[in-house]
Amino acid sequence: MEIIIVVAVVALIAVFFISQYNRLIRLNITVDEAWAQIEVQLKRRADLIPNLVETVKGYAKHEQSTFDAVVTAREKATTASTVADTAAADGMLTQALRGLLAVAEAYPDLKASANFMSLQEELATTENKVAFSRQFYNDNVRSLNTAVKTIPSSFFAGFAKVSEREFYEVEDPQDRNVPNVSFN
């Protein structure tokens, strides 16, 4: 009888260890999948940018510095390797795209162009997908980080070779500036 109790306790402990280990592995895989989705959406956006730049260039030939800023930001965004680098490059690219779209506002013929409108619509859709992917990634990173930091799964994190992950945070300098309000 004692041997059955010992075997049952050992079996329960083994099941507990295995379930904690598998939970951490599943969370880690989910974070990897979420990161892959961000990369897919950022690639899609990067692929749209050359067409958008060429379309705007046809109407606004003297806006070379804006075009150069977009191309440079796109290059950095496509070569970033870490979460922090990707987030920084993404913020820079977003700023450059805002500049490009501001240039487009000055050209009514461009704004009326079917090609430009289609590209702008695709870009807006892609931006929404990027935002959703970022949120999905950060939600999964939060779940993983919580599991890695809390007992009992924190005891198994090292064994499972799972560690905390960085959140995807885009710092947009424009979001920090307080707008000037004048009632004059």
Task: Give, region by region, the residue ranges found by the protein language model.
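A helix-centric hydrophobic-segment signal that preferentially recognizes long
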Residues: 1-184
